[in-house]
Amino acid sequence: MIFAEEYIPKQVKDCSILDSRKKFKNKKNKNEKLLLEKRFSWMRSFLKNKKNIIELGSGNGASKEILKNKKIILTDIQKYPWINKKIDMTKLDLGRKLKGKVDVFIINHSLHHCSNPSKLLKKMSKYLKKNGLILINDPEISFFFKFFLYILKHEGWSFKVNIFNLKKNIFRSDNPWSANNAVANLLF
């Protein structure tokens, strides 16, 4: 049922990052460029004069180009030519050199793919400089969003989980495409 507290699709369809990147690079795709510009534009003022900027779950790598900021280090669970560093955000290990050195973390439409968001946020705090920032942009689950997720059988949601439990994942973590689209609603 669309209005349920929980919906877990039987088959999660994988998203093709390569196709997404190809669409993004296509100069004719003006609608997607406009959407991405709107999605990222609010971040620009927070990135001024920042040196160490890390995006977790960078996917097609659009942020670096849309924000026109070469300082952004793109990370993802899978290695692609445009990704600077392969990192599983659920385990977030940036090494000792970056502890207390990161100015800004960006998580754009990726937090709902993290099986333990509270644990991730706690780990991120170890790497942030004093007064460092975490910029999060994640979908809010509305009636219409639930409807589209249900029809597409792409990703699910659950409001039944304890999102603040650092020891328990909120969904199975063996599939990088698993997600809980209720994360933004539950955290914020």
Regions from the PLM with identified roles:
Residues 30-51:
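Conserved alpha-helix/loop element of class I SAM-dependent methyltransferases that forms part
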Residues 54-94:
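Class I SAM-dependent methyltransferase SAM/SAH-binding core
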Residues 118-133:
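A short glycine-rich, Lys/Arg-flanked "PGG" loop and its adjoining helix->strand segment in the class I
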Residues 135-166:
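Conserved class I S-adenosyl-L-methionine
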